UniProtKB/Swiss-Prot annotation:
Pathway: Pyrimidine metabolism; UMP biosynthesis via de novo pathway; (S)-dihydroorotate from bicarbonate: step 2/3
Function per UniProt: Catalyzes the condensation of carbamoyl phosphate and aspartate to form carbamoyl aspartate and inorganic phosphate, the committed step in the de novo pyrimidine nucleotide biosynthesis pathway.
GO cellular component: cytosol
Name of this chain's protein: Aspartate carbamoyltransferase catalytic subunit
Gene3D superfamilies: Aspartate/ornithine carbamoyltransferase (3.40.50.1370)
Reaction(s) catalysed by this chain's protein: carbamoyl phosphate + L-aspartate = N-carbamoyl-L-aspartate + phosphate + H(+)
Class of this enzyme: transferase
Amino acid sequence: MSQLLTMSELSKEEISEILKDAEDFANGKERKATEQTFVANLFFENSTRTRFSFEVAEKRLGLEVLNFSADSSSVQKGETLYDTIRTLESIGAKAVVIRHQQDRYFDELKDKVNIPILNAGDGCGNHPTQCLLDLLTIKQEFGRFEGLKIAIVGDIRHSRVARSNAEALTKLGATIYFASPEEWKDETNTFGTYRSLDELIPEVDVMMLLRVQHERHDHYETDIMKEYHENHGLTMEREERMKEGSIIMHPAPVNRDVEIASELVECKRSRIFKQMENGVYVRMAVLKRALPNVLGGMKHELFV
């Protein structure tokens, strides 16, 4: 049963195969379920890109989508997450996509349910499909990971994107640097080295900006965000000093003129909307891996 909970569970070869499948889907290869198959999407946190790209991926694969609303479900009556998943399994769901505010919510489920769990983000912990779409975007741009220098900039402490990407990119041979305000550093994330943003600007191949997660902070004021942009954001002046051929990435949603100058969101270096497009293809590949009996299995030459 091919669940996807964290990037640490994937080998380089497994990452390679997922990316190759995603690239095939991006190039127009089609794959349809061979029988009626239900997949349930459970989002306990707000989401636009992840939720809808999973739904588009499911529908493009010919899967039947069950969209779960916590507000109108028995969760409001005290039903546990485990009982909810077992209920969906009992009525015919063959896989579940879950986003949850609790770090590692899946620990209580993974050895108890009989259908694959696809983690769409757990608290401040992991975001494997975001990581995979970022890897696909980088691979399309540079053709490799080995030897690339990548800066992950912003709220490292609260970012599941930073955690998943730093681990996976290190595994694939890239060098990771972090740039962050002191209070948002995460000393438990040992996959990168902290340096100042202005030192990194002319050196790195990828500038990966992180959203300031105001919902996880006590203070979110205009003057504080203006100060953040000046000290830690990608300003127009900083973009002008970036390395030739380097790219800008952001998992979105973007706080314009906070993490990045509004004018740069769709500039020549930006791959922000390309990342979103790649999210559909990566999630198609992840679903195909999770449901081999109805979506088939393909082996590929290594893509890493």
